[in-house]
């Protein structure tokens, strides 16, 4: 496909984006808004943002959800801006500095919350800054400006949603159904690989791909949930399927690891059975029926616990999969599965990374303030706004540097494009609403195509062009003002990029160590006799951490294997029949405290000391298990865990 080619699948969204822009423009001028530009800009960003993220037309519900987050972020930012202005109106410089800190604080929060919800906090940060900067000439108009800004943004969001509904957004349901079938086949093929006990790298690639696909399916579930309330039953089933899919991965990998030391546990009966190739979900269904008969014939005692657990999870997966595809009423058997264990939320391992983002945003905003005050440039305020926008939105993404470059390219492209609209098109179309709408629809259409291709600078060009062309009421054409605005955007993006380069983010290794120690803590916390604690479902949270580890350290197989081993240890110890007595219970609490100290230790020396203490406590614990005559189902996984921690203690303690 050529650089300027237009694919058929890109046309519908391009028309949708053009419609959203035209609707916002028409409504803005019809209701005599002072700056319809904000409504048009909001409609464009809300519609184009999900398309840029998806690399194509977004699924149904994505635009509505993004609009909802934008409304929340705008209202939080407006309220924060009003509070700051009321409290510090007599000290303008302090007021702006507090706003810079507020923007940094919002970026810090957005780095810790779920990525899909972080948009609202990033927006809240720079909205307050926009209000404080804009009202500098006339502070008494602050409430009016805040109300107008909220109104214009709500109008833009409504227009984007109307355009989305008008062009019948595509549903993600069929993709979910296909992925459920394909994922089950892949799970069976992983178990075949693990029972064959072949090349470790092939197995690593297979389970790594399944972790990514299961995480992607969870993302699809979120999209389906946003799409319509009629998928509520499917959403409940998919949430349980996520845990079942992770359970299947865990049991398969444990089957592989067991054969490293005790290959005789997997009998020839099961090896021959899993030799049969499968291609479709129907093949898997037939094999599972046969496998259940084999287990009934051999007996539970003669079946390896990992295979028995795998078959049980695969059977439940199949049952819920049929319910998702048909979206029928949840029956009693399904309800029993869905009333599973409560999921545990873990503390973010990226706190240091979030603090780096706080300083990047705060320092870049303060730098913009100093630049504005030192130069006295009329568009210094515009540069400050762009600094806040770039840093607030870039920090929450995996590669902030590339986001800043995208904004720089976009603002550079917006200069000639905006010049064409400012000098030629808008002056010749302002007398006709129809011609004005057509001219902006053409802009939205072609940039909408480029946004779907994820062309570098396309998203920034769309927002920056709309921001600098004259869409005020009434329209005034001052070339110096246009040039100042365009140059202010470019300077702001360059300053933000400079701060991102100067304030290095060296938190990657620390985050990796914290993640690995959290896996250790989870494995240790599984050693408990507390019934409520044993029923807690840690699996989704553990695999979420594993997915983060895979993204932070792509290709680092030793780290992935260590993390997976800790997850397997957690699952095995969680189900182990640990003797119930006060002596062991007290020691469980002591080991959990020590594991927490390992995670929270701020220096390598303290971390090594606490980790050494944890290893000593594990030795004492194994002795206590022998005294209390614990069965092999308890002593063996504890011994394996202690051995793993001894082997990898340097990787788990050194920065």
UniProtKB/Swiss-Prot annotation:
The main location class comes to membrane
Classify the protein's membrane topology as the record does: Multi-pass membrane protein
Compartments, record wording: Cell inner membrane
Q: Which GO terms describe its molecular function?
A: transmembrane transporter activity
Q: Which Pfam families match?
A: FUSC
Q: Which family does it belong to?
A: Belongs to the aromatic acid exporter ArAE (TC 2.A.85) family.
Quote the function comment for this protein: Forms an efflux pump with AaeA. Could function as a metabolic relief valve, allowing to eliminate certain compounds when they accumulate to high levels in the cell.
Q: What is this protein called?
A: p-hydroxybenzoic acid efflux pump subunit AaeB
**Organism expressing this protein natively:** Shigella flexneri
